[in-house]
Amino acid sequence: MKFKLLLFILGQKLKKAAKKSDSFRKFIKGKNVRIVMKTAAGQGKAFIIKDGSVTTLSKDLTRADAALVWCDGNTAFSVLSSGDDEAIIAALTEKKLQSEGNYKDFIWFLTALGKLSPQQS
């Protein structure tokens, strides 16, 4: 449940940044990508960045340019809410997080997440 709430909030922050942050709009301009963040059990959300805007979907999580697949929702929540970049690297190393698809899109999305400021909640 916490993981679903985190994904919802993340989607809202991405949408808000795409509308209100000049630097974020500049970062996503011209990028057309579909990123899925989900658990190994298949619960998650797709983040679609297209034409300078962000939309989200909770269905059709099989199609993605890149996917971040967490071993479970509790681990994902713990790592993502920590705000610690090293925790993401540790999760990858420990196989608690798997990346699928285009690795460049995976890194681009993590960079986009890093550009979200706390004021954009």
Q: What does each model-found stretch correspond to?
A:
Residues 1-121:
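Feature captures hydrophobic
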